[in-house]
């Protein structure tokens, strides 16, 4: 191996940030901010927990319950602050163009014409996915599912890992964190199986979804020219397109990760055969 096993995570982190910077440029600051917010927020939750563990030994029994509620309130404040901070950035970036245009339209009623100051705002790559992953991390730490990591590189790689930053799936730190950080020796079986999964995903995306999309657009854009049978066919093709699109992207993501020896959760496991709404959501 060219890179020692213990340093492979560093190469993966650099490559992931390079990939992100090429695709998002200056907007990389937002994922850096999210990373730092959950890292230091997690450490603060650890500190509160450790302080409680030490203090409760010296407290009288009658005061422990009150002290525990104070600690719980402090932890909740930290968790809610981090969640709102990350959600606020997501909402601002996703809807600033829309609300900016609404503001301009309202001013035009009073014959005040200005251009939308937010019209050139771009969305950072994968902001929805990494924001939800960041929130899942801080909420899990708050609930005591695991201790927050004191390794900034490990937390950073968990969020920016390049295969899942574009289309998900939304990662869980307890399932993905150690895998991306530990480093894996080259494995021929993983490499070939991962490559096969990538090609299968590309087949679904390019051959099935993109082809179905041509007919769907034709029928939906000119629906007045087609009778009921064609509309039904269009609906069925649209369902097929959605399935092939998302399933194909998930296969590409999982295959890319598998080539690095990393197993990612299947995020689109035949949802259309679900028997209940909750099962559909889980699949």
Name these PLM-found stretches.
Residues 1-283:
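Membrane-embedded transmembrane alpha-helical bundles that form the catalytic cores
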């Amino acid at each position: 191996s060219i890179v020692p096993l213990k340093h492979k995570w560093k190469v993966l982190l650099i490559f992931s940030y390079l990939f992100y910077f090429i695709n998002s440029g200056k907007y990389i600051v937002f994922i850096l901010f999210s990373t730092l917010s959950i890292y230091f927020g997690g450490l603060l939750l650890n500190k509160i927990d450790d302080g409680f563990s030490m203090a409760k030994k010296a407290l009288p029994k009658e005061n422990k319950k009150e002290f525990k509620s104070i600690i719980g309130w402090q932890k909740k404040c930290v968790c809610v602050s981090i969640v709102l901070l990350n959600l606020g950035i997501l909402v601002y970036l996703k809807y600033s163009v829309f609300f900016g245009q609404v503001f301009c339209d309202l001013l035009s009623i009073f014959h005040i014409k200005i251009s939308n100051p937010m019209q050139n705002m771009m969305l950072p790559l994968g902001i929805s996915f990494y924001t939800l992953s960041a929130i899942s991390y801080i909420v899990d730490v708050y609930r005591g599912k695991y201790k927050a990591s004191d390794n900034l590189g490990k937390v950073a790689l968990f969020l920016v890992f390049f295969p899942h930053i574009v289309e998900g799936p939304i990662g869980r730190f307890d399932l993905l964190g150690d895998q991306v950080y530990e480093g894996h020796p080259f494995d021929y079986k993983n490499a070939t199986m991962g490559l096969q999964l990538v090609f299968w995903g590309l087949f679904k995306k390019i051959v099935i979804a993109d082809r179905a999309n041509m007919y769907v657009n034709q029928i939906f854009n000119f629906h007045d020219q087609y009778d009921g049978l064609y509309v039904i066919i269009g609906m069925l093709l649209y369902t097929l397109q959605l399935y092939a699109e998302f399933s194909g992207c998930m296969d590409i993501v999982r295959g890319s990760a598998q080539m690095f020896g990393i197993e990612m959760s299947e995020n689109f496991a035949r949802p259309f055969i679900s028997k209940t709404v909750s099962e559909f959501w889980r699949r």
